[in-house]
Design a protein with these regions (language model features):
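Short N-terminal binding/cap micro-motifs at the start of the first secondary-structure element
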Residues: 14-18
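Flexible gly/pro-rich beta->alpha loop and the following alpha-helix that scaffold active-site loops
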Residues: 24-84
Length: 224
């Protein structure tokens, strides 16, 4: 039975990456929405799985589309439907649940290890190298399990029940996506970056092969 996977994309250089590959591999149908550009969101009834990607905006921004996304997230939560939030998307889930989005203790832009904090989802390595592109984080919902931490920022991911995952970092970019992120938003890496990596270094690092596998594992877990 195929699923309709609705992806909310907010930055032209931050697309679904390997999430698209997962949709194809599982015979699911992916629909990409750009709510900040076109003001259109799917309904909960036409959403089997919701993916909320990163954004240069913050959930704290007083914008209609930002608030409307949280209305959709709330309906998804109420119906126990699967949600994957990445970066801004993870923060949107937490804010929907009433938690704060605040400045992280460090601005992380580039590649850095994340460490698995919970064994509920099997088949994930204890340590992975992920792409970070953020300076804010959310509080971890008390009803959720802390899923990942980095050396500089504890709140890197959470698992809520068996159907909602929030990640503060990026497992989804493949190498083409990393180039697209870094060449278009490279200035962000050069300002007060606690990982001290340049756009060129970020691109040349390459993508660890495991990251796509873990992305598939996480999506399979919430989609089951």
């Amino acid at each position: 039975d195929f699923m309709r996977v609705n992806v909310l994309q907010h930055a032209p250089n931050q697309g679904p990456g390997s999430i698209q590959a997962w949709c194809h591999a599982r015979d699911n149908e992916m629909f990409v929405y750009h709510p900040g550009n076109f003001g259109i969101l799917p309904t909960v009834d036409e959403t089997d799985l919701l993916v909320v990607l990163g954004s240069p905006n913050s959930p704290n921004d007083d914008l209609d589309w930002v608030k409307n996304e949280r209305v959709l997230i709330r309906k998804m939560l109420d119906q126990h439907k699967p949600i994957l939030g990445i970066c801004f998307g993870s923060q949107q889930i937490a804010k929907t649940l009433g938690y704060k989005v605040l400045d992280a203790p460090a601005k992380e832009v580039g590649w850095a290890p994340v460490y698995l904090q919970d064994q509920t989802i099997t088949g994930i390595p204890d340590k992975l190298t992920a792409l970070h592109w953020h300076e804010q984080m959310s509080e971890i919902p008390t009803e959720a399990k802390l899923l990942f931490s980095s050396d500089l920022v504890k709140n890197q991911g959470f698992l809520l029940g068996d159907n909602v995952i929030g990640l503060q970092f990026h497992f989804e970019p493949q190498i083409d996506n990393v180039r697209e992120i870094a060449i278009n938003d490279g200035a962000y890496a050069l300002e007060n970056n606690d990982l001290h990596q340049t756009p060129t270094e970020i691109i040349n690092h390459g993508v660890p092969e495991k990251n796509k596998d873990v992305m598939f594992t996480l999506l399979d877990f919430i989609a089951k």
